[in-house]
Amino acid sequence: MKFFLGSALFLILTFINLVRAEFEFITPAEDSRWARGFTYAVKWKQPTEQFVEIALQYADSNNTLITSSGVIPSNQTYWMVKIDKKWLMKMDNITARVVAVPQNGTASTVYVGPQVLLANTFYWKMVVDVSPAFSVNPIDKKLAIGLSVGLSCCILIVLFLHFATRRERRILKNEKELEMSSYRKH
């Protein structure tokens, strides 16, 4: 008896999950921000029904309809919606919900999708990790100045020695030329 109840419960929960997973939204993400005047796409995985209707409704207790897509054939898995100013009802922000109603000829089930925030303006939401102000260690600053001055002086000394001893560093082709040149001078 215990085994039968456990397997029956498993089958019921599996059926509930299958019914809930029948219609799955891909976009928008939960709590997305949709700005007035912009066009957004509502995408979903292809359902088993022939036709589907997607709607945007206010997330209040009345579930007032904002706009609807009309009947969409099953081979189309997106709906483009442009946010209108009158949907905001003279407010700055308002929460809406995307819903789907598969049209299968019988009593249709309403599948509730993600909530979106309809907004009057568009902005990027940036999350900035605030770290403490960057402080320069005075020893590091002195070390950087000292190293750069010291290396510059070394380079200048090497260049000076290179150009100052240029005549003494000549390489002669062979030793006889050296002897001949010193013999003629005497």
Swiss-Prot record:
Residues on Cytoplasmic side: 164-186
Domain of life: Eukaryota
Main location: membrane
Glycan-carrying positions: 62, 75, 93, 104
Extracellular side: 22-142
Subcellular location(s) of the protein: Membrane
tRNA processing in keyword set: no
Annotated membrane topology: Single-pass type I membrane protein
Membrane-traversing stretches: 143-163
Signal peptide interval: 1-21
GO cellular component: Golgi apparatus; membrane
A single GO BP: endoplasmic reticulum to Golgi vesicle-mediated transport
InterPro entries xref list: Pma1 (IPR028000)
Alphabetical keyword list: Glycoprotein, Membrane, Signal, Transmembrane, Transmembrane helix
Name assigned to this protein: Uncharacterized protein C21C3.17c
Biological source species: Schizosaccharomyces pombe (strain 972 / ATCC 24843)
Lineage: Eukaryota, Fungi, Dikarya, Ascomycota, Taphrinomycotina
